[in-house]
């Protein structure tokens, strides 16, 4: 019996190697979130275990927030408790997780975020299309991006990508997703909670980075048209 696989191709072999290393790091979190097995790695392609086609939708926001919270809590406990958001974080097997600031410097110049002193989680691009629902729970796919990020930042990407894909979200469901996320990221010795205001500001920051993809990559709705709250006042 031949197992189904998914092949992702890369023009740049460095991108392929980085994605493979990111997948390995995420798989080692062991937090009851499925990570597809890497069947083979070549300079220009990665071949993954195929985990099906069941895509989540807006009604799955809470279960996705729970999975994201478990991943961030496991990463903080295992490695990122010692990380700073403005410095790269060395990991096992030579992996270095990029800092939050450097790859976003232009966007931060336009919209400063005072995050350097906050505890570190990570960003792996929690676009709703980068999750699958399986018989064994939530799975994550697409390992191209991995940087440090404040707690709640990747949850904001989940919110904005879901709204831009499916339309306006129920504000109460977004609120519940944040509560669920904070419940699963809670630490005994540091405040990792993302406030509703922080979530809104992070979403506006993501809007800077995703607006150019409107009507591409599954984004059918402009964020200002589907924002599930009033536009927050943010520092410019």
How should these model regions be labeled?
Residues 11-13, 42-46, 52, 76-77, ...:
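Catalytic cores of nucleotide-enabled group-transfer and carboxylate-activating enzymes in metabolic
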Residues 53-87, 101, 105-106, 111-112:
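Conserved kinase catalytic-core helix
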Residues 155-189, 203-222:
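Active-site activation/catalytic loop segments of kinase-like enzymes and analogous catalytic loops
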Residues 3-42, 46-47, 52-74:
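A conserved alpha-helical element in kinase catalytic cores
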Residues 194-206:
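Amphipathic alpha-helical protein-interaction segments enriched in hydrophobic
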Residues 227-236:
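Regulatory N- and C-terminal appendages and interdomain linkers associated
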Residues 1-2, 110-153:
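Active-site acidic catalytic loop and adjacent metal/ATP-binding pocket
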Residues 30, 68, 72-79, 112, ...:
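A general structural signal marking secondary-structure boundaries and capping sites
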